[in-house]
Design a protein with these regions (language model features):
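Catalytic cores of the polymerase beta-like nucleotidyltransferase superfamily
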Residues: 1-151
Length: 153
């Protein structure tokens, strides 16, 4: 279902071979289900930022999101954001959480996401993980034609 580019697969396998869970999450899963080529790939993991940095110590890293649990890994294929499973509280700026608490639960991490269609994960061994029925809700994203289109029919 999700076509995983080799550079993304390599990052997932490296996390797993280091003893961590690793799942594609969010928009890349949603887009793949909708038969849209993802623009980027995000990975969610039970590894904490320090552990992610250690696993990818031989890669160039972007650490601007580290306090929110995100470490970006620069690969030959592109930049992959790896984010620790987390819980969030408060959004004073409307975009970034005021408080982040790491968790060991993939389901808790998915629960914090904005929409059910973004609260899905995909594991290379487990396939689709969809605890909130986001796949069923994808049909809600499709809209009817605009009034202009209807008049031209």
């Amino acid at each position: 279902m999700v076509n995983i580019p080799s550079y993304v697969f390599t990052v997932v396998k490296r996390l797993e071979s280091s003893g961590f869970q690793a799942y594609l999450a969010g928009g890349c899963v949603r887009d793949s289900i909708m038969n849209i080529a993802p623009n980027d790939y995000d990975i969610t993991t039970n590894a904490r930022p320090e552990e992610i940095k250690n696993v990818f110590r031989d890669f160039k890293l972007i650490l601007t999101g580290e306090k929110h649990g995100t470490v970006a890994v620069i690969t030959n294929g592109g930049i992959i954001e790896i984010t620790s499973y987390r819980l969030e509280k408060g959004y004073t700026d409307g975009r970034h959480p005021d408080n982040v608490e790491f968790t060991s639960s993939l389901i808790e991490d998915l629960r914090r996401r904005d929409f059910t269609v973004n609260a899905m994960a995909y594991g290379i061994h487990d396939g689709l993980i969809d605890p909130f029925n986001g796949r069923d809700d994808i049909c809600l994203l499709y809209t009817s034609p605009s009034p202009r289109d209807k008049r031209q029919s």
